[in-house]
Amino acid sequence: MPEPAKSAPAPKKGSKKAVTKAQKKDGKKRKRSRKESYSVYVYKVLKQVHPDTGISSKAMGIMNSFVNDIFERIAGEASRLAHYNKRSTITSREIQTAVRLLLPGELAKHAVSEGTKAVTKYTSAK
């Protein structure tokens, strides 16, 4: 069975630059698509909690998947709550209720207090 022809090596995952240019065969440069992630924010929180600790790219990938998963769960639950109450807008109240439903005990309490603090900070900055 003949082996398929190998193309150029795949670009390295998780590179530092958001937009780089890949070389095409005919000499024209093409912009690589942006990969959105929470890595910058995960890193900032890590440095607040443990300033002398680093994180591997594999661990960062896991954290990114975790944040995406939790975001989707909360958004889905908040959407359901808005639908049940015949509302077309997801407010902080739906998010708060979704967090209370999804997260266990003490974790939910901490998440709600941090969320309330963030909303207060945002509204006071306006």
Swiss-Prot record:
Q: How does it assemble?
A: The nucleosome is a histone octamer containing two molecules each of H2A, H2B, H3 and H4 assembled in one H3-H4 heterotetramer and two H2A-H2B heterodimers. The octamer wraps approximately 147 bp of DNA.
- The reply on keyword Ubl conjugation is yes
Q: Where is this cross-link: Glycyl lysine isopeptide (Lys-Gly) (interchain with G-Cter in ubiquitin)?
A: K35, K121
Residues the record lists as Phosphoserine modifications? S15, S37
Q: Which UniProt keywords apply?
A: Acetylation, ADP-ribosylation, Antibiotic, Antimicrobial, Chromosome, DNA-binding, Glycoprotein, Hydroxylation, Isopeptide bond, Methylation, Nucleosome core, Nucleus, Phosphoprotein, Ubl conjugation
Which regions are flagged for Low complexity bias?
1-12
Residue positions where N6-glutaryllysine is found in the record: K17, K35, K44, K47, K109, K117, K121
Residues found modified as N6-(beta-hydroxybutyryl)lysine: K6, K12, K17, K21, K35, K86, K117, K121
List, alphabetically, the SMART domains matched.
H2B
In the record, N6-methylated lysine modifications are located at K117
The entry annotates sugar attachment on: S113
Query: Cross-link of type Glycyl lysine isopeptide (Lys-Gly) (interchain with G-Cter in SUMO2): positions?
Result: K6, K21
Q: What does this protein do?
A: Core component of nucleosome. Nucleosomes wrap and compact DNA into chromatin, limiting DNA accessibility to the cellular machineries which require DNA as a template. Histones thereby play a central role in transcription regulation, DNA repair, DNA replication and chromosomal stability. DNA accessibility is regulated via a complex set of post-translational modifications of histones, also called histone code, and nucleosome remodeling.
- List of residues that carry N6-crotonyllysine: K6, K12, K13, K16, K17, K21, K24, K35
UniProt xrefs under InterPro entries: Histone-fold, Histone_H2A/H2B/H3, Histone_H2B, HISTONE_H2B_site
Modified-residue entries (N6-methyllysine), positions: K47, K109
Q: Where are the N6,N6,N6-trimethyllysine modifications?
A: K86
**Modification ADP-ribosyl glutamic acid, positions:** E3
PolyADP-ribosyl glutamic acid modified-residue sites: E36
What are the N6,N6-dimethyllysine sites (modified residues) in this protein?
K58
Which Pfam family, any one of them, does this sequence belong to? Histone
- According to UniProt, the name of this protein is Histone H2B type 1-K
